[in-house]
């Protein structure tokens, strides 16, 4: 039996760990520090699956009926 991937489920939005260059752009655009972003526990099943570590920022790309895509950012904590 193969392992089920949460990311393959249709109700789970796409998650990706941001690189530092993209992160700086986002933080500057919103005029925030990474610690001010909503939190995501390192023990969250999605964080475990994508290999997120404390201090990372995860970009969540959700489908939106009005905007097409909506971007959310989460700061990974221990």
Curated annotation (Swiss-Prot):
The keyword Heme does not apply. GO terms for cellular component: cytoplasm; DNA-directed RNA polymerase complex. Part of the RNA polymerase complex. It is an enzyme of class 2 (transferase). GO terms for biological process: transcription by RNA polymerase II; transcription elongation by RNA polymerase I; tRNA transcription by RNA polymerase III. It is found in: Cytoplasm. DNA-dependent RNA polymerase (RNAP) catalyzes the transcription of DNA into RNA using the four ribonucleoside triphosphates as substrates. It catalyses: RNA(n) + a ribonucleoside 5'-triphosphate = RNA(n+1) + diphosphate. The lineage of its organism: Archaea, Methanobacteriati, Methanobacteriota, Stenosarchaea group, Methanomicrobia. Keywords: Cytoplasm, DNA-directed RNA polymerase, Nucleotidyltransferase, Transcription, Transferase. This is DNA-directed RNA polymerase subunit Rpo5. It comes from the Archaea. Its main location: cytoplasm. Belongs to the archaeal Rpo5/eukaryotic RPB5 RNA polymerase subunit family. Pfam families: RNA_pol_Rpb5_C (PF01191). Its EC number is 2.7.7.6.
